């Protein structure tokens, strides 16, 4: 909708390279910068990711996987915005006057990322799977990202 000024959050969560959750949703607040929109999206995706991590750990325990395997589970979040990565990874965060007012709201997710040893990885914008859920992409890009999601 061209008249809407809210950013759209889009992400996909995979377990063993299989998509288990994907979402596209308008953000409830209006972001004043791209970095702010990305931080809001990171926090929202983490709220969806953490219960899935807990579920995988519970299922692993239920089938008798060694605890060591469960505690060393590799979890990563791919982000294409460098500013959002710096703000998300740094504890205490490196605030700028513009970033301080919204970064305070996401302190919990920075702490969870550190506690759960989740890796935040910089990904090139052309590799960002979430773009399928946030914007119209050219056919070639759509087909490329679709193949990545499907594991082809």
What are these model-predicted stretches?
Residues 1-152:
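Divalent metal-binding acidic/histidine catalytic loops
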């Amino acid at each position: 909708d061209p008249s809407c000024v809210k950013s759209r959050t889009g992400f996909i969560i995979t377990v063993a390279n299989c998509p288990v959750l994907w979402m596209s949703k308008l953000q409830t607040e209006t972001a004043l910068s791209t970095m702010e929109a990305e931080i809001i999206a990171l926090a929202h995706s983490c709220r969806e990711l953490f219960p899935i991590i807990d579920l995988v750990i519970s299922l692993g325990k239920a089938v008798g996987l060694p605890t060591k395997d469960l505690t060393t589970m590799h979890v990563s979040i791919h982000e294409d915005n460098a500013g959002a990565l710096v703000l998300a990874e740094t504890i205490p965060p490196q605030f700028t006057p513009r970033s301080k007012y919204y970064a305070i709201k996401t302190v919990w997710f920075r702490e969870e990322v550190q506690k759960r040893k989740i890796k935040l990885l910089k990904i090139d914008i052309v590799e960002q799977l979430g773009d399928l859920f946030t914007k119209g992409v050219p056919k070639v890009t759509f087909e490329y990202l679709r193949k990545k999601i499907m594991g082809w």
